[in-house]
Amino acid sequence: MFMFKKYLYVLIFTTSFVIGSSILSAQNIVSLTELTVHKTPTCGCCKKWVDHMEDNGFSVTTEDHQSLAMIKDDLKIQPKFRSCHTGVSQEGYFFEGHVPSRYVLQFLSESNPDAIGLSVPGMPLGSPGMEVDNRFTPYDVLIHFQDGTSK
C-alpha cells in the first residue's frame, strides 16, 4: 500500500509539472509574440481582429495600406485564400484573415516543417472580428506550406 501511495504521489507531481510547464510555455510564446498586421485604413473588422489578438496577449502593430496585393503576393498567399488583413509574425509566418488567436498560438508553439502560415479565407460570420449577434458560419483554418499546398 505504501508503494502504491508513493507511486501515486510521484505520478500526480510529474503530471502537474508537465501540464504546468506546457501552460507556462504557451504563455511565454504569446507574451513574446509580436504581429504586424497589414490592413486597409477603412476596415472595421480588421481592428476587431487586432483587438481579439491583443486581448489574448499578443503585441500588435498595424500598418495601413491602400492595396494589400503586393504584400500577400510576397508572402505567397494565393488569391483563393485571401481575406481583408494579413498578420505577420517576427519569424515571417503569415496569419491571413480572421484566424483565432488560439490557432496562432498552437501554430507558433508546434513544429511545422515547411509551413508558412495559416488562413481563414473570406470573412466568415462568427470568426474573431466578424461577430454579429449569435450568427455563425462554419469555417476552416488552413495551414499553408512552402510548396503551395494547404490543408
Residue ranges with predicted function:
Residues 1-5:
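N-terminal secretory signal peptides that target proteins for export/translocation
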Residues 9-20:
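Bacterial N-terminal signal peptides
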Residues 24-26:
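Boundary at the C-terminal end of the N-terminal hydrophobic targeting segment
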Residues 28-56:
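Local sequence-structure signature of Cys/Sec-based thiol-disulfide redox active-site neighborhoods
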Residues 34-35, 58-60, 91-94:
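Short active-site oxyanion
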Residues 42, 49, 64-67, 100-104:
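Stable alpha-helical elements in mature extracytoplasmic
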Residues 47-89:
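N-terminal, post-signal-peptide region of Sec/Tat-exported proteins
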